[in-house]
Amino acid sequence: MFIQRFLRSGLALGALGCACPFVAACGSSPTVGGTPRHTGQSVYESAPMPGTSAGARGGAPVNAGAAGAGSSGSSGAGSASAAPSAPAGGGSQSTPRQVQETDIYRVDGNRLYYLNSYRGLMVFDISDVDHPALIGRSPIFGDPQEMIVTNGVAVVVVGDWYGTAPDGSPFYGSIARGLDCTDPGNIKNTGEAYLGGWVQDTRVVGSVLYTVAENDGWQYGWGYGATNYSPTVSIASVSFAGGLVTKVGEKTFAGTGGVFNVTPNAILLATQHITNPSAPYDGPAQTDLRYVDISDPGGTITVRGGLTIDSWVSGWGPDNGRWNLDFADNAHAHAIGCTSQYCGSDGDTYLLTTVDFANPDAPAVASALPIANLGWSAAARFDVDPSGSYAHMYLSPSGYYTGNTGQTPLSIYDLSKPSAPQLVGQTGLDGQIWLFMPQGQQLFALGNTYSNGTYDQSLVDVQYVDVSNPTAPKRLGATEFGSGWAWSPAADTFKAFIIDATKGLAVIPFSGWDSNSQGYNNGLELVQFTPTALVGSGTAHTKGWVQRGIFVGTRLLSLSDQALAVVDYSNPALPNVVSELTLARNVVNAQPQGATIAELSSDWWGNDTSTSEMRVLPIGDAAETTDNGRGVSVPIRGVDAQVFQNGTLGYVVTDVQIPVPCGPNGYGPRAPNGQCLAYTQEIQVVDTSNGGAALRGSVTLPILPYSSYGGWGWEGFYYYDWYNGADVVQVGGDALAFRRWYPQYAPGPNGPVYEDDLDALYVVDLSNPDAPAIASLTVTDDLTTWWGNMKAIGNTLYATDFRWMSQPDPNAPYGTLYTVRYYLDQIDLTDRAHPRIGQRVNVPGVLVGASSEDATMLYFADYWYDGPNERNDISVCKLDGGACYLQSVTELDGYVGSVIVQNDRAYTTVQEYDWMLNNNGTYTPPYFELHQLDLSNPQAPVDRIATDPNKGWGWLLGVAGDRAVVTSGWGQVAVDVYRLSANAAPSYEQSVRTLGWYANALTRQDNTLYLSSGYWGVQPIVLQ
């Protein structure tokens, strides 16, 4: 649901994440010949932009929401009763070893360790718990999963990790890393262990970390000549004795799932049974159970006996399906699984299978009890006393298969007789059940309910059940919370459902969206209980998608990726937020300014739907590894922020909500009082001189009727954004131009009448930073055309529109030959209060830049048809007397990315694919080329190309001085830096692993690049 956002700043950003961001719709196959080009030509025809047709209005769709990528998916591990404290150290032969849970947090004395999905490992001083202070941070590349802390050393498990193995080969999977935090300001790496696949679950026994990982058969590169690999599951042991992380052993098995249950001496592993490695997902619904001996305190793994059972134990559900498998008594395994592989209907049958592992080398099935009508993913929980005093299973079917009564049955099974488990009691629960949490003779059931069958009224629900008599379970009470749509991370892991029986409190984090209040509804729910009743609950509203609520002394700490909040729960019915510390801001731009850096953040997805922030920090604190309190900040009205810099003045453009009259169908968003709302843009001047941050003047653009759910500045990640260009352009330092392309027509006596004021180019004059002024003009009123691609050349603003020469046949739009003529519109801003269109000139494509010596020598990118092949070129033409005379054409084969012009040189990346013929007529694996096109002699351009057929994928991200930065890999997991020179092709210099998955902006000061990476913050990259 999250949209990765790429803001345009002073450096053009490539449309990342699509195979063809510049030229055409992916997979298009032009079949029409283009008009020949020759020197001196001044009339041009081109192919229309991708997706345009007769009557098409152009422009990217308007999106509601903001920039960030993603909620935290971290669901680590930890104690289910209170904040876990750091263990004293590894086990020994004389001390019985205990199984410990990992988690995304750890409390050790006056230190809080928190594994933040965006900012990595964060260390806080909580000696003054009401005012926690960040005292150290270790950024992490990849997706932090969970950790354990021993004697100040954190062992962190990271998934989605790209890099190279010790032998230099490409590696994608998971790692376990040791981080010595004894000096939080100088965290050190104490070793790494490479773990195949994606780690699904972990446990600690003594001083050994055990992991289970699933590998779907990753392939590297383009896979030419490669075979398809079957999925595998691996268990590994990693020693952290003495604070040093080393891999001890690893065992790999065919299959998927990887559900494992850990005791002090054994791992019981469940994987999907594969009968045909060539079709691993088409086999029977069977599961392989294996007994793995881990009795060696050093971490040696020994596989003992195993067998195959006739059901599929699913890895879906909370904690990687952990609750579908039990081995608590170290002798009998209990497994609940479906007899069809995907359990896709309410008619599928489950099996409750009991396996006798009294002899670990020769297990045997003791019983298999069929259970009908459980749906796709049943909620199960085994509650077995290792000493044998009781053995139960709590079971509820998937809520999607329970009919329309709003009730879900709770069934209790007695497992005390391995050969004859039986159903002993039932009762009804409300809604759908996600997770069961046993609490002695009581049981918590976590789920959600629906109101009137609408998903936007889905509340989190906690029900409390007396199971002291399993034959007659009785519901003791329930509480609902999270108005609107709500969810809890406890649906994914029991570690988020914190119970402190001594306090009679259960703490459940939740997050959601309330459409009535048009706001996020996040925080902690405090549920009060006694052995006989659920007596009440209270809500502490905090920021961010809350992952945990943990007890620390007399306070609760609310942990989200965005914020750490301190909650006073002395009155559990009315908990009070004492303080809140921001942990991760969605940084959209960072402008270095000598000794300081100005960071703009806009956090709509992070739960601030009305405000952005400009912060000025010491340049040495750009990465924010500590919080030393030396930064200054100022709030800015609106969200979806972008900034245009003019010295120490920042022109911040945001989307703001404005009350409007309600139309017959409403305007979409409504305030709590029923007032209709619409969006528009606001420009706020921020003065960051002398290390400060002060608001100057502001101005708001007119509201558009189609702006209810949308904003501007969202482009940059669609393949067709190359021709739209930016919707906001800075001209001459102190002016901004805005493209409004949401045309509307009013009824007229002779047909629709174009309403100019609703579709215009707006000019904001910022020459007086305390009193900005607005003016506008209409670029075109043609009902069938398009305009856009605003571009500033010095103090001159240009826009582009096109005219159809041959339009698609509406009855066969894909089989029609059609062409357009592009026209360059020069916008006269001599009088900014009265802008007007000067001359309109036919040109060969869309404007990408101009000569630094002669502003009438213009550079264009064009797309045209040449039989079955796509053709792209960079054309140079001389603007003279109402015409643009062609000087040269340089053809570029393949898909072309963004074109960046600097000092009479055009830079772009071109992707070649295997369906494109090379000069020798043979097919090769896809590869990219980085072009440096020297246009200083417009009649004789020189194209210098850097390429490596083995490199594969990459797009030009930006050009900063004598460096070009190219994305590396399918996801933006790294960048390649190329050194630029006047008389040679770009030369590869270094690769840098990047934080996060996208870049909002790239800036440079001296020998350091600053990559603005959203919630991952600012990443300084020191150039070699």
Where are these regions (language model features)?
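C-terminal motif of bacterial Sec signal peptides marking the signal peptidase cleavage site
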Residues: 22-25
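Feature marking well-ordered beta-strand scaffolds used for ligand recognition
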Residues: 27-1024
